[in-house]
């Protein structure tokens, strides 16, 4: 089994590829297979953003592995104007939907309830098969459950500071 424990910088060449769905790219622990069929064990640092299309991983044996986003069934959303597209994005964000944002369009994982809501808002919705690369959040860091305070964890950039006023 090819063991992978760390991310690395992009390179012009690689030894193997993983083609993974968003769900698989979001996991820090995963058993999967390279596109050539080799068994892989991912043991990545927890709390990091999902792997993105084009990311590189370094295997324990020194091989470089490139990540590809697997095409998934998505809803492609377009609207008549920027206001309607912004309104659609607002309603999807209010439901904490993973969302890919393009120039004049939105994409999300196929969901018939959300598709119906978007159509009621006046959006044009079509189903497409494409790699899904949603935004991973405004804070740029991964999700964490740190109880050790700021010395152990901090968001960058710090947008606000909570605490008792003195």
Swiss-Prot record:
Q: What is its main location?
A: cytoplasm
As for subcellular location, the record says: Cytoplasm
Q: Is Calcium given among the entry's keywords?
A: no
Provide one Gene Ontology cellular component: cytoplasm
Keywords linked to the UniProt accession: Chaperone, Cytoplasm, Nickel
What parts of the sequence cross the membrane? Answer: none
Question: According to the UniProt entry, where is the signal peptide?
Answer: none
- SUPFAM superfamilies to which the protein is assigned, alphabetical: Urease metallochaperone UreE, C-terminal domain, Urease metallochaperone UreE, N-terminal domain
What InterPro entries would the database entry show? UreE (IPR012406), UreE_C_dom (IPR007864), UreE_N (IPR004029), UreE_N_sf (IPR036118)
Q: Superkingdom, according to UniProt?
A: Bacteria
Keyword Phosphoprotein among record annotations: no
Alphabetized GO MF terms: nickel cation binding; unfolded protein binding
Q: Which GO terms describe its biological process?
A: protein folding; protein-containing complex assembly; urea metabolic process
Q: Which family does it belong to?
A: Belongs to the UreE family.
In terms of HAMAP family, this protein maps to:
UreE
Q: What biological function has been recorded for the protein in this entry?
A: Involved in urease metallocenter assembly. Binds nickel. Probably functions as a nickel donor during metallocenter assembly.
Q: What is this protein called?
A: Urease accessory protein UreE
Q: Which gene encodes it?
A: ureE
